[in-house]
């Protein structure tokens, strides 16, 4: 007879947000890109955790903080299959269904080094386009279009 030992690899939180099923190697980037660390609340990160769905995944838990639907939808660009769960008293009280936003403002950096958004005191602004499973972003200022991964790695 075989026994299975199930153990949480990342400690449960009493109240807050759990972002699960983030593609492996993306969790850290999401933390900085979306300024999820701009809090004094405890943040627990699991990187390269085993996942039945995708082999490996990242996980982020932020205590006493709830993401808005807009914030959660911005994550969909880089973690389309992620789940964003609201936790209260150690229970999932709400699951946010992610959908791509039409725009993303003041989060990403334009990869075009000649774009005025680098030198002027303006917030970045991108229109999100999805076609045949490919996601691209069009900068409001230089009007150039980029693959979403190019924008992810632009710093």
UniProtKB/Swiss-Prot annotation:
It comes from the Bacteria. Keywords: Metal-binding, Pyrimidine biosynthesis, Zinc. GO terms for cellular component: aspartate carbamoyltransferase complex. The keyword Metal-binding applies. Binds 1 zinc ion per subunit. Its cofactor is Zn(2+). The lineage of its organism: Bacteria, Pseudomonadati, Pseudomonadota, Gammaproteobacteria, Enterobacterales. This is Aspartate carbamoyltransferase regulatory chain. Contains catalytic and regulatory chains. GO terms for biological process: 'de novo' pyrimidine nucleobase biosynthetic process; pyrimidine nucleotide biosynthetic process. Pfam families: PyrI, PyrI_C. Involved in allosteric regulation of aspartate carbamoyltransferase. The keyword Transmembrane helix does not apply. The gene is pyrI. GO terms for molecular function: metal ion binding. It comes from Yersinia pseudotuberculosis serotype O:3 (strain YPIII). Zn(2+) binds at residues 110, 115, 139, 142. InterPro entries: Asp_carbamoyltransf_reg_N, Asp_carbamoylTrfase_reg, Asp_carbamoyltrfase_reg_C, Asp_carbatrfase_reg_C_sf, Asp_carbatrfase_reg_N_sf. Belongs to the PyrI family.
């Amino acid at each position: 007879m075989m026994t299975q030992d199930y153990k949480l690899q990342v400690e449960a939180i009493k109240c807050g947000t759990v972002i699960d099923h983030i593609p492996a190697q993306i969790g850290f980037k999401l933390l900085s890109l979306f300024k999820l660390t701009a809090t004094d609340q405890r943040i627990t990160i699991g990187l390269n955790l085993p996942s039945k769905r995708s082999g490996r995944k990242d996980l982020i838990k932020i205590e006493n903080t709830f993401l808005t639907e807009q914030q959660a939808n911005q994550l969909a660009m880089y973690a389309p299959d992620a789940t964003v769960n609201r936790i209260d008293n150690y229970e999932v009280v709400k699951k946010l269904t992610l959908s791509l936003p039409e725009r993303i403002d003041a989060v990403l950096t334009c990869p075009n080094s000649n774009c005025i958004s680098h030198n002027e005191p303006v917030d970045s602004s991108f229109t999100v386009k999805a076609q045949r499973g490919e996601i691209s972003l069009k900068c409001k200022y230089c009007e150039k279009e980029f693959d979403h991964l190019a924008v992810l790695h632009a710093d």
